[in-house]
Amino acid sequence: MHSAEPSSSIPSATPAPASPPQRSSRRRRVLLVLLISFASLIVLAAIGILVWANVGVMQAESGPLAKVRTNPAVSIHETPDSFILSPADGASGTGLVFIPGAKVSADAYLYKLSGVVVKSGLTVVVTKPILNLAFFDQRPLTTFTNAAPDVDTWFVGGHSLGGVRACQYAAEPDVSGLILLGSYCANDLAEVDTRALSLSGSADLLSTPDKIMDAAHLLPTATTFFPIEGANHARFGDYGVQAGDGVASLDSSIVRDVITAEVDSFIRTG
């Protein structure tokens, strides 16, 4: 008998390691996929912000807007950046750059601010914030003051989030004072040599009187606080009901009269 010869197993072939060019190509593909994914997320986020900022913008009520547009004592000029309110006669050489609240149309403030235009000869430039949100609008103050070259004394002001942005302008040397309507500062102006007027509403549930007083330490020493009994957040403009706000018991025309009287007194006492 012949003895069986031991079977010899043939080892399986081991794949050759990837060459450096192959590994480099794979890394590039992975990096490209990651970059495309990241860019897509940025584009989607930008689209989302654009849609959100332009949906639900609170428009000016037609009645008050018609009143100011048909008032022969007030001149209205619109530019891509702003609305300019000026007295038909007797401009004082003093101006106010006013910044709207978040997602509120700029022309919703024309009627409320037109009273002081007539009473004191004030020129008012109501800005059109980028994306309807003041914190996105980082344009210099001269973007708006240049719209009224005959004005030589400037105040800044705003409503709600617009007031927060106005506070940032208030520290500039060419600004004579700050006017806040239902608003407060986020930056510290306590050591800035300027003046401020803060009007609030007792029925304001957004910029509540408590929130305004909690931030009062950020305002200049020379600040006048004037609470308007019965006014809510939306009463500082004319754009209807605002979600989350309180119910106003004071008529809109009376709020306009108070704004006119207090702003006129403030700018005259400087």
Segments predicted by a language model, with ranges:
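Short beta-strand/loop motif that positions the catalytic acidic residue
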Residues: 192, 198-200, 204
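Short alpha-helix in the alpha/beta-hydrolase fold that links the catalytic acid
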Residues: 112, 207-218
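Conserved alpha/beta-hydrolase
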Residues: 113-134
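Hydrophobic membrane-insertion alpha-helices, especially the h-region
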Residues: 33-52
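C-terminal catalytic-base region of ester-bond hydrolases, centering on the histidine
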Residues: 214-270
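Short beta-strand element of the alpha/beta-hydrolase
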Residues: 92-102
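Gly/Ala-rich beta-loop-alpha elbow adjacent to hydrolase catalytic centers
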Residues: 157-166
